[in-house]
């Protein structure tokens, strides 16, 4: 005999009317096997809920109540648990999430998350002046997290996919120093009593196109002076670990980062000068990091130079150069030719540019740079080729001063 409610209406399987008059629907989630209940004030509302539950189960979605409460923050934690990435990279991702997402989008339930949420979020970040690359990084955390929710049967469709567009301020184009600027800067450093100790390191970064983390991570065992090769097999990174902020020995950024770079004469001479400097100034490495010792570029305390320290002395060098150039230009009654701001990456980018200007094969450039993606190298190569082509074409416009009259 069919069960009825207090109005005499037949109740379907799983439907119940409670003593307080409210309606309940009991069911078992087919994926998790858990029993669940939903409640409504009237039978019509309950049956609308039943339709949605049955549709979800037909689509192989999890209907378990606890899963429905899953927040975006918890989803991200699940996603991170699936990633086999370096500890430093994981910490960077979590730091980015905590700073921008945890207290904004993070508390929204995954099943309630809409495309409008993320578009509004990105738009607000754009209004704050965040860079395009920063917003792209946040998209790179949100999108795969929600993709995991789709794969796990929590939601039908990823609400984040396709939302990343032109949000954020465009990245400034990375400018390499011209050959003239490079030569002037190195000459200034060589003639400076204050900055001359930094000359070998700068020459190595220019000539070998190394990342700053690779440069400060070089040990004397990585440098084969006999065969004139640099063996790049790791890097030093500075970040917060279990013991606070300190250096960590790390693998190269990608497998392509492991490489043997032939030394140019400038680089070979730079290593010889650095060895002499270390002996003369007492800049001997006295630390062991990750089982490695004998670091080449050190502070007066015998520890490797921090990346921020490299950028700091580069900034000071440019400021000193520009101060001297401005004074000289004033004396010579001309406009000063100032050096643009530079960073450690400028030296690497400039070195890559010199390779391109000398028509080094793009595949060789990719190998020297340690790029896993050939497109990164080609972007630099094509920029150089395009600039050279434009200059060559425009040079055709240099007509003689006296142009023959057309008869």
PLM regions with names:
Residues 10, 17-116, 277-292:
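N-terminal DNA-binding module of tyrosine recombinases/phage integrases
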